[in-house]
Amino acid sequence: MSNDKGLEEIPEDQSTTPHKPTSNVGSRLTRLFQSTGQIETNYDEITDSFDAMELKPELLRGVYAYGFERPSAIQQRAIKPIIKGSDVIAQAQSGTGKTATFSISALQKLDPNVKGCQALILAPTRELAQQIQKVVVAIGDFMNITCHACIGGTAVREDMKALGEGPEVVVGTPGRVHDMIQRRVLKTDHLKQFILDEADEMLSRGFTEQIYDIFQLLPQSTQVVLLSATMPQDVLEVTTKFMRDPVRILVKKQELTLEGIKQFYIAVEKEEWKLDTLSDLYETVTITQAVIFCNTRRKVDWLTDKLTARDFTVSAMHGDMEQSQRDVIMKEFRSGSSRVLIATDLLARGIDVQQVSLVINYDLPANRENYIHRIGRGGRFGRKGVAINFVTADDVRMMREIEQFYSTQIEEMPMNVADLI
């Protein structure tokens, strides 16, 4: 959190004085952004494994239990500076792993001896706030912490009761959070971190005044972390007014991952016919290594059982499994002793296998951002790959959305697909 001099450390005895906005220390940043549309990264350090982040053992256990294998690009860059206490601006799209980035960082910085809100997370919508709460609770599963979602549309009395119990992490929407701080129900005396997720969305929804008011009610020493897909003028103003010498991290969208990957679809009239379609595909092509994605853990288990019953050798992996079990499966898959892996989206980003020649979306992903994480497996390291999507009548709209979003074309699978893999 910034003081008038912008870059100086704040003396301890000022830690409870409310925030005063700075002068426009970021005019150079603003000019640079206006010419490029992107912030300029000023931090290059990369930590490429969760083990190397020096996380608390119970937090590390939660990270692996949640299903993460290795950190995504933003997690490799942003977790360490946030943990060290720097103000951080991260420009990143959804689907890059940013929720886990600030959740892990916030959990690491919690003091177990202090009861009360130490991390406050703002989100533009109730749904996103609830989603973030679930991630924080899941990753913090072994840490004995509580996380409360403070959102509009719920009973104020219940909110007040939950906040009175002193949850260590509070995630909410600007209106309700501001109301609770003003009522002194949400106490900020112990607050260490203020995290704004999807800042561009929040400001475009007209929350600017409430966000500025919240800043005024926080201790001067509060660390500020801001995440935004775009950096319009109103977001830049927040960064220049309220942040002190921030670390700036730009994570570009992974556009290159679709290059060199042939994308096809097979029209499947009914959901029940997908299994036979997959069996036929097995007969047609010689698979070096393939990953098959389903949308639920239950579907992964069901498909594994069905294929095993038909004498196909497959491995399955999802977040319900113990980490040790998942490690064994990944080791077998990487070494090539297991050739077909059936998995959920949760693990899409952790599967880094060079030999994967084929990705099959048994289910199209529920959101278009996950498409690139699934398909990206096939074309990593400059290798060619093939992606085949099973598409029912209900999926056509999502497939068109994916094509539009990535400016790509998914064509009907040709008869000679075996020659392409």
UniProtKB/Swiss-Prot annotation:
Using the UniProt annotation, give all residue ranges assigned to the region (Disordered). Answer: 1-26
Function as written in the Swiss-Prot or TrEMBL entry: ATP-dependent RNA helicase which is a subunit of the eIF4F complex involved in cap recognition and is required for mRNA binding to ribosome. In the current model of translation initiation, eIF4A unwinds RNA secondary structures in the 5'-UTR of mRNAs which is necessary to allow efficient binding of the small ribosomal subunit, and subsequent scanning for the initiator codon.
Name the enzyme's class: hydrolase
Q: What is known of its domains?
A: The Q motif is unique to and characteristic of the DEAD box family of RNA helicases and controls ATP binding and hydrolysis.
Native source species: Aspergillus oryzae (strain ATCC 42149 / RIB 40)
Q: What is this protein called?
A: ATP-dependent RNA helicase eIF4A
Mention any one GO cellular component term assigned to this protein in its UniProt record. Answer: cytoplasm
List, alphabetically, the SMART domains matched: DEXDc, HELICc
Q: Using the record's annotation, list all stretches that form the Helicase C-terminal domain.
A: 260-421
Family (UniProt) = Belongs to the DEAD box helicase family. eIF4A subfamily.
Keywords, sorted A to Z: ATP-binding, Cytoplasm, Helicase, Hydrolase, Initiation factor, Nucleotide-binding, Protein biosynthesis, RNA-binding
